[in-house]
Amino acid sequence: NFQAMLADVPTELGETIKDFHNMEFRLQQLREAVAENKAGRLAEVQWLVDELEARAEEMCKGERLHREGKLAKRICHCDTKVDNILFDADGNVLCVIDLDTVMPNFIFSDFGDFLRSAANTGREDDKDLDNVNFNMDIFKAFAEGYLKSAKVFLTPLEIENLPYAAALFPYMQTVRFLADYIN
């Protein structure tokens, strides 16, 4: 409902964190980290850099569609995760918190980032990767619930690319954290 309530708000709202969910920018940061290899760790993670680069063009789809005039930016929370939702004692949603990241972005931002935390079977910082998986039941339930209110303002292209959004945010976090690790 957060996005539905803001669907008609003009996107002139300022960008609070420049390029926060800009995949092309995040890949450029990774490429700079790889080129500089400040911490001398590149050799041990080169395989992961190669995997990320192999998917880079696909993962920059949002920025490409926007440049082509096919995908608009909307007002988004840009840090949608379970920890940023307050619930009452019965488990009902009271409100969304942590509003310092509310700014124009692609609809993929809120949909994909929420699933990154909600559909993860492990903890966000889980050290045991055997605990980490993607819960398709949560994805399906969330997508159905999301579309009940969002289908009135989403374009067919946005709806078609919601599964892309679910893949984008784990990818983006990997790119961000790997750049930090290499630096």
Question: Model-derived features: where do they sit?
Answer:
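Active-site activation/catalytic loop segments of kinase-like enzymes and analogous catalytic loops
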Residues: F108-V152, L168-N183
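A structural signal for short hydrophobic/aromatic patches embedded in well-ordered alpha helices
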Residues: L52, F142, N161-L162
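Catalytic activation segment of kinase domains across protein kinase-like and atypical kinase folds
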Residues: D83-R123
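Protein kinase-like catalytic domain
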Residues: Q3-P10, L147-A150
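Active-site-proximal structural scaffolding
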Residues: G69, C78, A89, P104-I107, ...
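All-alpha amphipathic helical-bundle segments outside canonical DNA-binding/catalytic cores
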Residues: L154-A166
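ATP-dependent phospho-/nucleotidyl transfer catalytic cores
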Residues: D8-H77, V82-D90, L168
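A broadly conserved amphipathic alpha-helix scaffold signal in soluble, globular proteins
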Residues: N1-A4, E57
